[in-house]
Amino acid sequence: MSQSKRLRIAIQKSGRLSKESQQLLKSCGVKFNVNEQRLIAHADNMPIDLLRVRDDDIPGLVMDGVVDLGIIGENVLEEEQIERQLAGKPAECTKLRELDFGSCRLSLAVPNEFEYKDANSLEGLRIATSYPNLLRRFMQEKGINYSDCMLKGSVEVAPRAGLSDGICDLVSTGATLEANGLYETEVIYRSMACIIQSNKTQSTEKQALINKILSRINGVIRARESKYILLHAPVETLDQIVALLPGAENPTVLPLNDDTNRVAIHVVSTEDLFWDTMEELTALGASSILVMPIEKMMG
């Protein structure tokens, strides 16, 4: 297949989304090997090329139509869209769906000794950040005057180094803030990884491949969120047992050989089956309870 007909997907070369982006595509049946010295990986079994680039380059590559799809954090996407709108550059793309990894929040944080009451406490402060556009939008909405200190990394050390009064940075667990003597004050943006598509017109062949990949991604994520549950149940408490199964739809009920008083139940559950629920099932006479992960789902 010619180069122009190959689907080009941009993913983060290294960082918090890189490994999970690669694993997601492999779970969708895309076979490829990554050479750390090369920026492009060619799929072995599909007309797909993976471009491994800096995360903040991905939105622009998609918006400019250089690549067809990109896997990126919503925070990076939003930051770049604002930047390009201000610069009068193309800033449009289509977000196909959120993914099930990369959860974080963009938050304001100040030193432990700082007395914070509300957002107005930030008036006149110098804030270090890698996300000046998202920070500016938040501060303008609140009517707060401030100055920013643009840093590309190690934002959390800025107050201790005397570069700023506070920071605006990504937070996952808060451990990094705590280690640097900071505490979180305001969440200004919540983010997940997402997959985006260029708005350029695609060939029928390439769009069909995009639809196939998206369908598989949907199936992979549904499978990750679901469990396959099997158990034996007394007929007399069947309705009560089915009602306890979280997220269950239309369970399969099968007779057991030589036992007219009990049945087998098979069900796909979209919620976790916790220990207390299993204990309630047991109290209703359920037995041989198995909870298994699902590798793939479709339909």
Curated annotation (Swiss-Prot):
Keywords: Amino-acid biosynthesis, ATP-binding, Cytoplasm, Glycosyltransferase, Histidine biosynthesis, Magnesium, Metal-binding, Nucleotide-binding, Transferase. It is an enzyme of class 2 (transferase). InterPro entries: ATP-PRT_HisG_long (IPR020621), ATP_PRibTrfase_cat (IPR013820), ATP_PRibTrfase_CS (IPR018198), ATP_PRibTrfase_HisG (IPR001348), HisG_C (IPR013115), N-reg_PII-like_a/b (IPR011322), N-reg_PII/ATP_PRibTrfase_C (IPR015867). The keyword Metal-binding applies. Feedback inhibited by histidine. One of its GO terms (molecular function) is ATP binding. The keyword Nucleotide-binding applies. Pathway: Amino-acid biosynthesis; L-histidine biosynthesis; L-histidine from 5-phospho-alpha-D-ribose 1-diphosphate: step 1/9. Its cofactor is Mg(2+). Its EC number is 2.4.2.17. It is found in: Cytoplasm. One of its GO terms (biological process) is L-histidine biosynthetic process. It catalyses: 1-(5-phospho-beta-D-ribosyl)-ATP + diphosphate = 5-phospho-alpha-D-ribose 1-diphosphate + ATP. Its main location: cytoplasm. GO terms for cellular component: cytoplasm. Catalyzes the condensation of ATP and 5-phosphoribose 1-diphosphate to form N'-(5'-phosphoribosyl)-ATP (PR-ATP). Has a crucial role in the pathway because the rate of histidine biosynthesis seems to be controlled primarily by regulation of HisG enzymatic activity. NCBIfam families: hisG (TIGR00070), HisG_C-term (TIGR03455). Belongs to the ATP phosphoribosyltransferase family. Long subfamily. This is ATP phosphoribosyltransferase. It comes from Shewanella frigidimarina (strain NCIMB 400). The lineage of its organism: Bacteria, Pseudomonadati, Pseudomonadota, Gammaproteobacteria, Alteromonadales.
